[in-house]
């Protein structure tokens, strides 16, 4: 394809807009698709996303559209929609995506009901042989949109494709490292959202920085235990998409998952804590805990978050239960 063949970004939220800016900053024309044609027209006219990224200009190389036909014939397509909507969006765009290059999944989560990771969902929906990749790592949309230095991981089963896509999307301030460990990257992204809620609860309860540091370390140990039976590699979890993303989202109120947990810790109900905003970890918690239980993987922090979100346990009872667990070797 020519250098003028666009890169698609499907999804006009904060992260989709930020990735569109990053791809345009890497020297590519970008087609930014929004489900709402009116919102797409407004974005195209205003050259800004006032709802999600007010004050951040849209790169001149971005064209916003609400027409699915505009997605055909791209070099690659970044799917940037919430994890629980990935299947529906892929089904609705299956036709144009057949000629839209590799599909890069940017949602971090596990589908409720099927307990499927995002790459598995894509493989179930897209035509056989459609190349699929996953992008994940420590990144806030506002930082990427403003061109602040950020590094993430791109994974594809074909190592050569992973390297090529990373090179395609990397720019002056947005660096992509590549791997063929798709499942390891997905586990890091989905799992850290759940564990970031736990860290937010600790902050909201005023339990101190020492408690939060201990929780981050123990939560990371849970991710490592979970990854092995599902084929994720330890070195992947120790990189950007695992430990890097966990540290970022477990330490900052900019993270929706951390902020959700913080409100839970301060006494809000799950519905009140959500406040109409998406916290992917709230949807992933039950799936993560269920998958772990089915394989006999001990994940007490993830299970505690799932119970709190489901309303079957109180924050105080969960904290008391975790503190009463038997002492053990640190690496057991």
Swiss-Prot record:
InterPro entries the record matches: 6-PGluconate_DH-like_C_sf (IPR008927), 6PGD_dom2 (IPR013328), G3P_DH_NAD-dep (IPR006168), G3P_DH_NAD-dep_C (IPR006109), G3P_DH_NAD-dep_N (IPR011128), NAD(P)-bd_dom_sf (IPR036291)
Binding site for sn-glycerol 3-phosphate: 108, 137, 139, 192, 245, 255-257
GO terms, molecular function: glycerol-3-phosphate dehydrogenase [NAD(P)+] activity; NAD binding
Keyword NAD: yes
EC id: 1.1.1.94
Subcellular location per the Swiss-Prot or TrEMBL entry: Cytoplasm
Pathway involvement of the protein, from the record: Membrane lipid metabolism; glycerophospholipid metabolism
Annotated Gene3D superfamilies: N-(1-d-carboxylethyl)-l-norvaline Dehydrogenase, domain 2 (1.10.1040.10), NAD(P)-binding Rossmann-like Domain (3.40.50.720)
Keywords carried by this UniProt record: Cytoplasm, Lipid biosynthesis, Lipid metabolism, NAD, NADP, Nucleotide-binding, Oxidoreductase, Phospholipid biosynthesis, Phospholipid metabolism
Binding site for NADPH: 15, 35, 108, 141, 256, 278, 280
GO biological process: carbohydrate metabolic process; glycerol-3-phosphate biosynthetic process; glycerol-3-phosphate catabolic process; glycerophospholipid metabolic process; phospholipid biosynthetic process
Catalytic activity, reaction form: sn-glycerol 3-phosphate + NAD(+) = dihydroxyacetone phosphate + NADH + H(+); sn-glycerol 3-phosphate + NADP(+) = dihydroxyacetone phosphate + NADPH + H(+)
Secretion signal, residue range per the UniProt entry: none
One Gene Ontology CC term in the entry: cytosol
Main localization, broad class: cytoplasm
Superkingdom of the organism of origin: Bacteria
Active site: 192 (proton acceptor)
Family: Belongs to the NAD-dependent glycerol-3-phosphate dehydrogenase family.
Stated role: Catalyzes the reduction of the glycolytic intermediate dihydroxyacetone phosphate (DHAP) to sn-glycerol 3-phosphate (G3P), the key precursor for phospholipid synthesis.
PANTHER family: GLYCEROL-3-PHOSPHATE DEHYDROGENASE, GLYCEROL-3-PHOSPHATE DEHYDROGENASE [NAD(+)] 2, CHLOROPLASTIC
Protein name: Glycerol-3-phosphate dehydrogenase [NAD(P)+]
Highest classification ranks of the organism: Bacteria, Pseudomonadati, Pseudomonadota, Alphaproteobacteria, Hyphomicrobiales
Gene: gpsA
